[in-house]
Amino acid sequence: MIHETAKIHPAAVVEEGAKIGANVTVGPFTYITSTVEIGEGTEVMSHVVIKGHTKIGKDNRIFPHAVIGEENQDKKYGGEDTTVVIGDRNVIREAVQVHRGTVQDKATTVIGDDNLLCVNAHIAHDVVVGNHTHIGNNAILGGHVTVDDHAGVMALSAIHPFCTVGAYAYVGGCSAVVQDVPAYVLAQGNHATPFGLNLVGLKRNGFEKPEIRALQKAYKEIYRSGKTLEEVKPILAEMAQEWPAVKRFSDILETTERGIIR
């Protein structure tokens, strides 16, 4: 069903059954399959491919040659009807690829709201991207990766499958991340190592000085005290009772499967 206010270029192909919302625009030579749903106000430019069981929210901008909802590159994939879900107000730049999920995980790839996915970024199967993130040019998020709210993965960086980049963390350009990056941490290199807190990001996002000082103390406990992680956990748990940001920083110690960058 195509809303009466949607504007579909005559050279675009929108299969019967696709749900195209109010005030959506679709540019020439774009291909949208019958199982796609696009929310109101979204702009789909020329030469875009949107396939499969893909649901896209409101007011997104999708630039030329982006491919969303294509079959994933997992060898176990057998053509199952897995999905892509994208929220609102995202900017998806030229040649970005977002692949559908696998039944071996949650069968969906998720992108939240207000994200910037730069040119040729690759979002693999079963990735979960939060809100307000920045994924740089040619960055690669491997299968099952999580990038939490307000995190940044800069140009030409690669995140190993099953890794997490925590909230407000920042992965510098040309980095290879093979373990989890805790929230708020600045990481760089191949393999990526921690270089302190993402202080610029914290200040830009309104963190107060006392909270930043608490995070700096927590960071030193993990990375500079010489203590084991088991020794650090009760110290951080006590700090977390007063500072929610410290809890977010330390939660990954309990959930990590690949370990954290050291």
Swiss-Prot record:
Is Repeat found in the keyword set?
Answer: yes
Name the reaction it catalyses. Answer: a (3R)-hydroxyacyl-[ACP] + UDP-N-acetyl-alpha-D-glucosamine = a UDP-3-O-[(3R)-3-hydroxyacyl]-N-acetyl-alpha-D-glucosamine + holo-[ACP]
Question: Which EC numbers characterise this protein's activity in its record?
Answer: 2.3.1.129
Instruction: Name its cellular compartments.
Output: Cytoplasm
Any Pfam family: Hexapep
Tell me, in a sentence or two, what this protein's role is.
Involved in the biosynthesis of lipid A, a phosphorylated glycolipid that anchors the lipopolysaccharide to the outer membrane of the cell.
- What is the protein's quaternary organization? Homotrimer.
Q: Which NCBIfam families match?
A: lipid_A_lpxA, PRK05289.1
**Protein name per its UniProtKB record:** Acyl-[acyl-carrier-protein]--UDP-N-acetylglucosamine O-acyltransferase
Q: Which organism is it from?
A: Vibrio campbellii (strain ATCC BAA-1116)
